[in-house]
C-alpha cells in the first residue's frame, strides 16, 4: 500500500501543471524558479547545504534544471529519541494549530498544522499554555513570561536560544547519537518544498526506516510523516518524509506574522525617534527577532552596508525603501521553512545545518 502511495505521489508531482506565476505573498506557495532562487540563497549563506542531481537523467524532473534537482545536507546530529512523554498520547483525536492572526475555529483542516501532544490531557496542557501567553501593550512592549523547566521551546519564543531546537539529555539518559542526511525537494503538486530524511547509526550503517520514526514527534508519525521512496534515486531508497499538504498554509501564517512584527517594529522605531527609551532592544526575542534576522539577508546584494548588524555578524544589513520592505523575501523562504520543520523532528539539530 505504501509503495502504491509513493508511486502515485511521484507521478502526481511530475504530471501536475507547472505554475510560473508567483503567489508567494498571497498563498505561501512558490514556483520552481522561486524554489531554485531560495535554494541558491540557502547554499550561498549556509555552505553545509548543496545542490544535487538525480541518480540518472531519467529520474530528473523537467521543471528544475539539471544539477539542481534537490538540496542536501549530510551528517546532521540527533542525540536523543523522542518518547511518549515528549510527544504526548499519539492516537487520540488530532488537534490543529490555528492561524492566531485570524483566530480560525473548527472545521477546516487545511488551514492548520497538527499540534504535538494531542490526547486526553490536551485540555489541561492547553490551559497551561494559555497561562504562558505574553501580551503586547499599545506601545508594542511584550509582557513578562515565567520560564518553566519542562516547557518545550517554541521557535517564536526561543529564536535566539541555542536550546530552541534540542535540549541536552538528562544525566543517565545518554543515547547513541544518530546522524541524518536531509533532502529538500520541490513538490510541483503542492507548489511547496518537501523534506526527506535518511538516518544512520554510524557512517557505514544506515538506520532501518521504521526506526527513523523514533526521532519524529508522536502525533506526526504515519500522519504528517510517512516512509516514502525517494524519487530521485534508483533502487527504491526508503526515507522518512514530511508530507507537504499543509506547508503552504503554515508558511502563509508565518509570513503574515512576520509582516505584522515588522510593522510593529517600524512603529517602535518611529516612537524611538522622539523617545529613545522606547527603542527596540538588540536581539529582541520572539518572531520580531526572526524578522530582524531574516530581512537582513540577500543573495543578490553581497556588499555590507556600514557596520550595522542584525541577528549575527554573518548577516548583512540591506537598505530598502520603507514602503517596499517586506519581512521575508522569497529567496529567504527555505530558512523559515526549516525553522517550522524543526517542530516535527526537534531531536535533529536543524540549526547545525545553518552553521557558516
Curated annotation (Swiss-Prot):
UniProt xrefs under Pfam families: Autophagy_act_C (PF03987)
Protein transport as UniProt keyword: yes
Alphabetical keyword list: Autophagy, Cytoplasm, Protein transport, Transport, Ubl conjugation pathway
Comp. bias intervals (Basic and acidic residues): 122-137
Location of the region described as Disordered in the Swiss-Prot/TrEMBL record: 108-160
Chain segments carrying region Flexible region: 85-174
A GO term from the CC aspect: mitochondrion
UniProt-annotated catalytic positions: 245
MF terms in GO: Atg8-family ligase activity
Composition skew (Acidic residues), residue ranges: 145-160
Subcellular location field: Cytoplasm
Principal subcellular localisation of the protein: cytoplasm
Assembly description: Monomer. Interacts with atg8 through an intermediate thioester bond through the C-terminal Gly of atg8. Also interacts with the 40 amino acid C-terminal region of the E1-like atg7 enzyme. Also interacts with the atg12-atg5 conjugate.
Protein family per UniProt: Belongs to the ATG3 family.
Domain comment as written in the entry: The N-terminal region is involved in phosphatidylethanolamine-binding and is required for atg8-PE conjugation.
The name this protein goes by in its record: Autophagy-related protein 3
Gene: atg3
